[in-house]
Amino acid sequence: MIALLTGKLAHKSPDFIILDVNGVGYRVQIPFSTYYALPEGGSSVSLNIFTHVKEDAINLYGFRTMEEKEMFQLLISVSGIGPKLGNGILSNIEAQNLSDALIRGDLARLATIPGIGKKTAERLVLELREKVKKLGHGPLQQDVAPADAHNDMRDDVVSALVNLGYKEAVVQKTVDEIGVAADATVESLLKQALKKLMK
């Protein structure tokens, strides 16, 4: 079972990376929080890995911290929460903020996450509140870009948000409302779009 990978960042996108480990490329799915923390392509990185084995595939999920990985494992231990949704949850809320919401029983906050309705939010609090406490997780404390860069960035952000469960038409409208400044990055646009979508 793979628990940690260290290698060269061969490819970086909002929902997955390819990590070159001694000439072997590993496709690793990641939450946005990990994406934001990654250096530029070609850099050496280490990620905590969760290996999900299915009958027809082996999927790797990577996290910048053990806290994120532990939270992911807690999430997928809940009935109805698979790895894809667990990853999506951590893309919408930082692990420490999620811990805080679970401990406080903040159903309203949890229910704003795509794929999490009221019943699922209640189940998360019921099943994970005490487990999170034991882990000790606490709360956290424009110019126009060139057309090609604008379109590429916009497409990346729209694709990433649609993969998280947001409707494409809503995402496109939100991203267009934000606009793309000359110094904008995919990370900054994702943060702005998520902030608007989660209101």
From Swiss-Prot:
CDD domains given in the database record: UBA_RuvA_C (cd14332)
Segments of this protein annotated with the region Domain I: 1-64
InterPro entries: DNA_helicase_Holl-junc_RuvA_I (IPR013849), Hlx-hairpin-Hlx_DNA-bd_motif (IPR003583), NA-bd_OB-fold (IPR012340), RuvA (IPR000085), RuvA_2-like (IPR010994), RuvA_C (IPR011114), RuvA_C_sf (IPR036267)
Positions of region (Flexible linker): 144-148
Tagged with keyword Cytoplasm: yes
Subcellular location: Cytoplasm
GO molecular function: ATP binding; four-way junction DNA binding; four-way junction helicase activity
UniProt region (Domain III), positions on chain: 149-199
Region of interest: Domain II: 65-143
Signal peptide from the UniProt entry: none
Keywords associated with the record: Cytoplasm, DNA damage, DNA recombination, DNA repair, DNA-binding
A biological process from GO: DNA repair
A GO CC term assigned to this protein in UniProt: Holliday junction resolvase complex
Homology family: Belongs to the RuvA family.
Function: The RuvA-RuvB-RuvC complex processes Holliday junction (HJ) DNA during genetic recombination and DNA repair, while the RuvA-RuvB complex plays an important role in the rescue of blocked DNA replication forks via replication fork reversal (RFR). RuvA specifically binds to HJ cruciform DNA, conferring on it an open structure. The RuvB hexamer acts as an ATP-dependent pump, pulling dsDNA into and through the RuvAB complex. HJ branch migration allows RuvC to scan DNA until it finds its consensus sequence, where it cleaves and resolves the cruciform DNA.
Domain notes: Has three domains with a flexible linker between the domains II and III and assumes an 'L' shape. Domain III is highly mobile and contacts RuvB.
Subunit structure: Homotetramer. Forms an RuvA(8)-RuvB(12)-Holliday junction (HJ) complex. HJ DNA is sandwiched between 2 RuvA tetramers; dsDNA enters through RuvA and exits via RuvB. An RuvB hexamer assembles on each DNA strand where it exits the tetramer. Each RuvB hexamer is contacted by two RuvA subunits (via domain III) on 2 adjacent RuvB subunits; this complex drives branch migration. In the full resolvosome a probable DNA-RuvA(4)-RuvB(12)-RuvC(2) complex forms which resolves the HJ.
The protein's name: Holliday junction branch migration complex subunit RuvA
Gene designation: ruvA
